[in-house]
């Protein structure tokens, strides 16, 4: 546990306003605001590192002086059940702190709803909007297409080219014509001397 001292407070500030300022840094065990005299407060953090974060961010804000308290009993009664200033700011009854109030049972304690909303490393990359989408989740123009879909189209040869047309020789060429010698050449006529030739 770590206790934080807050000074230079406006006398009209309430414990609820103080809690709202400090609960963003971690779980608060209690918040106590002085009234007699007013002007300061003590906040108990469950984790010392949360208290250091709050001091770094809130010291000087609104003119406040915020520092780590070195005195465990500063500003508070030693008897948890006594003291006129020891009143629960939730119900107004003395004898218990707000974190023990019956009206807050089930809420998980002060600041439990916003546990460690800031990173202890206080790295800039955790501040601001951190929901920017990584480039690897962006849909590229070729999303869902396989590499073969992007390859150049090939001509389809489902129909094979027809074979070269062969000349048909179903009708064989006619053999060369031979001269017909069916008619034998005429025999030279035998000249027979007519018996009457000499008598002529």
Curated annotation (Swiss-Prot):
Keywords: Metal-binding, mRNA processing, mRNA splicing, Nucleus, Zinc, Zinc-finger. One of its GO terms (molecular function) is RNA binding. One of its GO terms (cellular component) is nuclear speck. Its main location: nucleus. This is Serine/arginine-rich splicing factor RSZ23. Disulfide bonds: none annotated. GO terms for biological process: mRNA cis splicing, via spliceosome; mRNA splicing, via spliceosome. Residues 113-139 have a biased composition (Basic residues). Coiled coil: none annotated. Residues 105-200 are annotated as: Disordered. Involved in pre-mRNA splicing. In protoplast assay, enhances splicing efficiency of WAXY intron 1 and alters the selection of the 5'-splice sites by stimulating site 1 (proximal site). Gene3D superfamilies: 3.30.70.330, Zinc finger, CCHC-type. A zinc finger (CCHC-type) spans 86-103. It comes from Oryza sativa subsp. japonica (Rice). The lineage of its organism: Eukaryota, Viridiplantae, Streptophyta, Embryophyta, Tracheophyta. InterPro entries: Nucleotide-bd_a/b_plait_sf, RBD_domain_sf, RRM_dom, SRSF, Znf_CCHC, Znf_CCHC_sf. Expressed in roots, leaves and immature seeds. Belongs to the splicing factor SR family. Extensively phosphorylated on serine residues in the RS domain.
